[in-house]
Each structure stands twice: as C-alpha cells, then as structure tokens.
Design a protein with these regions (language model features):
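Hydrophobic alpha-helical segments and their boundary regions
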Residues: 7, 12-13, 36-37, 84, ...
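Compositionally biased intrinsically disordered regions enriched in Thr/Gly
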Residues: 24-27, 32-50, 55-72, 97-379
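Sec-dependent N-terminal signal peptides of Gram-positive bacterial secreted proteins and lipoproteins
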Residues: 2-25
C-alpha cells in the first residue's frame, strides 16, 4: 500500500521536472564535464534524461566500482559512499535508504540505471540529488553540461529506527546535522527533526491502538473484522537545498491506519545555519515588491495549465498562497506545495509548484540575492 501511494505521488511530481528534460523523447547527446566532452554521454529514454556515470563521477572525483554486470554499483569519495543496487532497486547514501521503487518500469537495470552499448547511465534527476549537480541542456548544440554545486560544509547522519509493535510496523529515517556551525543552531534543528519523527511514530501507535479497539468491538459483537489488520508508518527526509549557509529539507510522514489507503503529510523547514532561525517566505522577499500577487498568479496559471491538459482536477478553487505558505528551496527556485485534499483529489498526491529564482530575482531580499546568482558552481 505504501509503495503504491508513494509511486502515485512521484508520478505526479514527474510533471514538475524542468521542461528541457522532455525536449527529446529518445536519443543520444554529448556530455560536457569541465573541459571534457564525452560523445553520447547523455541519453534521453522515453523523455527521461540519463547521464553516463563514469565521466560524471570522474569529474567530481568519485570512484565507480562495479564488479560485474549484475552487481551493486558503488560511488565513493572520501567518507561519502553511495551504494546502488539495481537488482533490488535500492539506493543507499551514507546510511540513508532512498525510496526508488517507482522507477523500475522506466529503467533497464533498476535503481535509476540503464545500460547502453556497455556503458552505464543513471537518471539525471537522481544523480543530481545524490551528487549535487547543476545540469543544463542545450538542444541546439545537442550537449548536456554538468557542473558540481558547492554545498555547505555539513555532516549529515541518518538516524534510522525500524519498529514492529503489535499491529504497527514503522520505518523512520531523519537527519542529524553536525559541522562548523553554531552548536545551538544545530541542536535546534536536530531537535525539530527528532520531534517530528517521534510524533509520526506516536501517531502510528495511536492508529494501531484505535484499530485494535475496533477489532475487539467487532469480535465482542460476534462479527469478524473485514479490513486490514495492519498499521504502518514511513517517515523519511529529502534535502532540497544546502548552499550559501541555508538548509532546506522536506520531511514526509506516511500513515496507513487500516483503511482503504494511507495518507501523507509533507512538512518543510528552511534554516539559516549560522543562527538556527527557521526562515519564512517573507524573509526572502522584499516587502513592497508585489511578490505575493506575482506568486499567486504563477501558481494559479500553472494549475489552470495542468487542468487544461487533464493532468489535474481541482476540487476547491485556489485563490492565494496566504501569508505563510508551505515551501522549500531548491537549486533553481522556490517550490510551493499543497497537502492531499487541500485543493485536489487524493489521487493527485501532493502537488508542487516551482517558481524559478530568475523570475523573482528583482523581488528577492538583497540579503538573499545569492539564490539567483548561481555563483557556487564548479568550473
């Protein structure tokens, strides 16, 4: 049930991949990394962009280890270790297990990978997430240019907890941060992550207790309970931005309480690593720039576009993001999102609406002009 739900969410989110990723449905392109150009180092497969692993990893000083065609793939750079298990369709980065089960229909090997002419490729979106890449496509030159993103000096440990208590099973993963930043700031952030994860488990335990009570009542009345006898929790995190002393993360809390389907609550936090302050949208924008009207129009127009293309059905008309909307930072912009049922049906999942930094560069608070400048890129 959980995997099916997450797959549905991800299918919706794939709509949001930058348009240049869908410029070609199939075909090879050149890959430029630094001063090196690799012929056919990039490839579109059914509209999804793949990058050849070896030249990208070499450019970023990662070592690629692959014993044979059917074995795990390991990417290593110092203490940074990424294990890709194509057969198991699993990726683990420094102890953090990423959910990529939804990728299997599109990949020839699984785990976001495909093999072409004895060369190993990986999905650009996944590889960017794992290694921190800035990927630009030039259709005219038939070239994909990859640069590394210079990220915050920050150690990220994954705290994992697997539970099995009565009717409840739970898998919980959340980040623990350390590094050359304010100890108080890091303590504040880590406390929030732990508290949010603990609350998810508490919610799962309550769901389990409620289900046990329902089953007991049914039995006492001489009836058998016909529903699922299981509750589950899947709590995970996704780091969206870690540059310029800013840290933006999304926490996902999936709960299944024995009904027809589960539900997911997505929570995002954006922090200033120097102070530990949680930043709101208003912190990033000039007060009198008209940003609220501009952003409301951008989101409204995108909703209309998706509805027109029959990719989305709107239950409740969207009017405004409000004064304190849910958002997170990404490498390219600010992404706004809505919870399940907030405006759209359950099947639509959590809809996300990215707005590029370029489009709001004149509205940004000068203190955060770095967001639109993209200065922190490797040569």
């Amino acid at each position: 049930m959980m995997r099916k739900t997450l797959a549905a969410f991800t299918a919706v989110l794939l709509i949001l991949i930058p348009i240049n990723c869908f410029a070609a449905s199939n075909g090879a392109m050149n890959l430029k990394t630094g001063q090196t150009t690799t012929q056919s180092g990039a490839y579109y497969n059914d509209g999804v962009l793949y990058l050849e692993l070896e030249p990208v990893c070499r450019y970023l000083s990662y070592t690629v280890t692959l014993a044979d065609a059917g074995s795990d793939i390991r990417l290593t750079n110092g203490s940074d270790t990424i294990k890709i298990d194509p057969a198991g369709n699993q990726i683990v980065k420094n102890g953090h297990t990423l959910n990529v089960s939804y990728l299997s229909p599109e990949d020839t090997l699984g785990g976001g990978c495909m093999r072409l002419n004895d060369r190993l490729y990986m999905r650009s979106d996944l590889l960017s997430q794992l290694l921190g890449l800035d990927v630009q496509t030039d259709e005219t030159q038939k070239t994909v240019t990859v640069r590394g993103i210079i990220q915050n000096v920050l150690n990220i440990e994954t705290k994992r907890n697997d539970l099995s208590e009565g009717l409840l099973t739970a898998t919980v993963q959340y980040p623990v941060l350390s590094g050359p930043w304010s100890a108080q700031a890091l303590e504040t952030m880590n406390g929030i992550f732990k508290q949010t994860a603990d609350s998810a488990v508490d919610q799962g335990r309550k769901n389990s207790k409620d289900l046990e009570d329902i089953v007991a009542i049914q039995k006492a009345s001489g009836n058998e309970y016909g529903g699922s006898m299981q509750c589950s929790v899947y709590f995970d995190y996704d780091i969206k931005y870690s540059q310029n002393g800013l840290f933006s993360v999304v926490l996902s809390n999936y709960q299944y309480a024995g009904g027809a389907h589960g539900s997911t609550i997505q929570t995002s936090y954006t922090f200033d690593l120097k102070t530990g302050k949680q930043l709101a949208l208003s912190d990033f924008m000039k007060k009198d720039s008209g940003y609220q009207k501009f952003l409301n129009t951008k989101v409204r127009n995108e909703i209309d576009s998706r509805v027109k293309e029959k990719k989305l059905f709107e239950n409740t008309p969207f009017q405004t993001l409000g004064n304190n909307p849910d958002f997170y930072l990404s490498d390219d912009g600010i992404t706004f999102y809505f919870q399940q049922y907030e405006y759209f049906p359950y099947a639509a999942g959590i809809q996300e609406f990215p707005v590029s930094f370029e489009s709001i560069s004149q509205m940004l608070n000068p203190s955060y002009s770095c967001l639109s400048q993209k200065l922190n890129r490797t040569a």
